[in-house]
C-alpha cells in the first residue's frame, strides 16, 4: 500500500488579464497519489522443463487536493482546439476538459428539434452532419459552462508480466507490459488543417443521413465548432505490449569444449514486437507533451512511435 502526498507543486499561477504579462510559476498545488502494488512470482520444473512467471501490478488513485485558498481549479494545457486539460480540487490531475457529444445531427429536423424548455435552439449554428453537444449543466444554453471531465491520461492500472522457459538447451523469455483505465487526447486526428495529410478516419465521415453517428461532416471550418475540445478526440489508450521476447539455444558443452569454449549460446530477440490496443494513434503510451508542469499527460500531438527492433546474437564464454 502507498499513500504519497506532494506539496507545493510548481504550476503556472492564475493572474488577471489586465496584468499584461504571462503567468508566473509558483508552489501552488498539493496532490495525493494512493494505491496498491502487487508482486507475485513462481518458479518450478517438470522433469527437464523449467519455468518461471512473475506478475507485477500497481493501482494508483491520483487526486488534486489543494490549489490555494482562493482557487478550486486551474486551466492547464491549451491548444487551437481550446483548453485541453484542467486541474480541479477533488479530481485527477490533470484531466481532459471539454464538451460531451451526443452523436451527429442527421437532418435539419433534428437540429430544429434540439431546443431548451423555452423552445430556443440549443445549437443555432448547427446543420446536418454537425455534432450534437450535451447541455451538461441543464441551463438551456450550450456554452463554456458545459465543459466537464472527459477523460484522463494517467492509468488506473499498470501491469508487467514476465515468463521464462528452459528445456534441453532451449530457452525463451518474454516481458509483457500494459496499462488500463487510461485515455489519450488524440490531437493528431485533426481534419481542420488544410496543409497536412488527413487521418484515415476521414473516410468514415458523415456524408448523408444515416451514414454515421460518430464522425461529423468534413469541413475546414464550422460555425458549430465541431473541432472544439470534446470527447470526440478522447480514445481508450489501454494496451498490452510485448516489450521484449527472446529465444535462444545453448549448444551442448561436449561440442564446444574442443575449441576452448565453455558455453556458446545463439539467440534472436525482438523488442516491441506487437501492441494490442484500440487506440488509433501511432502509440498509446502517451506520456506527455511540451509542458514543463506535467499538465500534458496523455495529449498525443503526434508522438514518435517506439521502434520495433530485431537482434541476432551470440554469447560466448571461454
Predicted feature residues:
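Transmembrane beta-strands of outer-membrane beta-barrel pores
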Residues: 1-6, 42-44, 57-63, 167-169, ...
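Extracytoplasmic gating/loop element in the C-terminal half of outer-membrane beta-barrel translocons
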Residues: 120, 179-271
Amino acid at each position: 500500500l502507498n499513500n504519497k502526498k506532494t506539496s507545493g507543486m510548481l504550476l503556472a499561477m492564475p493572474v488577471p488579464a489586465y496584468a499584461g504579462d504571462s503567468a508566473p510559476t509558483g508552489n501552488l498545488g498539493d496532490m495525493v497519489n494512493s494505491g496498491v502494488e502487487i508482486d507475485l512470482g513462481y518458479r518450478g520444473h517438470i522433469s527437464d522443463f523449467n519455468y518461471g512467471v512473475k506478475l507485477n501490478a500497481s493501482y494508483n488513485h491520483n487526486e488534486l487536493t489543494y490549489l490555494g485558498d482562493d482557487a478550486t481549479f486551474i486551466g492547464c494545457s491549451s491548444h487551437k482546439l481550446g483548453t485541453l486539460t484542467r486541474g480541479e480540487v477533488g479530481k485527477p490531475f490533470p484531466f481532459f476538459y471539454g464538451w460531451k457529444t451526443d452523436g451527429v445531427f442527421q437532418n435539419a429536423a433534428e437540429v430544429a428539434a434540439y431546443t431548451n424548455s423555452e423552445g430556443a435552439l440549443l445549437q443555432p449554428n448547427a446543420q446536418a452532419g454537425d455534432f450534437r453537444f450535451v447541455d451538461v449543466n441543464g441551463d438551456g444554453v450550450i456554452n463554456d459552462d458545459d465543459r466537464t471531465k472527459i477523460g484522463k491520461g494517467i492509468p488506473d492500472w499498470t501491469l508487467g508480466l514476465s515468463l521464462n522457459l528452459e528445456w534441453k538447451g532451449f530457452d525463451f523469455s518474454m516481458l509483457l507490459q500494459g496499462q488500463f483505465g487510461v485515455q489519450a487526447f488524440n490531437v493528431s486526428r485533426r481534419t481542420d488543417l488544410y496543409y497536412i495529410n488527413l487521418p484515415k478516419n476521414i473516410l468514415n465521415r458523415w456524408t448523408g443521413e444515416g451514414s454515421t453517428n460518430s464522425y461529423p461532416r468534413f469541413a475546414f471550418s464550422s460555425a458549430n465548432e465541431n473541432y472544439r475540445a470534446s470527447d470526440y478526440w478522447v480514445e481508450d489508450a489501454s494496451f498490452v505490449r510485448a516489450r521484449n521476447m527472446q529465444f535462444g539455444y545453448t549448444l551442448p558443452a561436449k561440442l564446444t569444449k574442443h575449441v576452448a569454449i565453455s558455453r556458446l549460446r545463439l539467440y534472436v530477440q525482438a523488442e516491441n514486437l506487437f501492441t494490442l490496443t484500440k487506440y488509433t494513434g501511432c502509440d498509446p503510451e502517451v506520456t506527455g507533451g511540451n509542458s514543463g508542469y506535467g499538465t500534458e499527460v496523455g495529449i498525443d500531438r503526434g508522438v514518435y512511435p517506439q521502434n520495433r527492433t530485431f537482434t541476432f546474437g551470440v554469447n560466448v564464454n571461454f
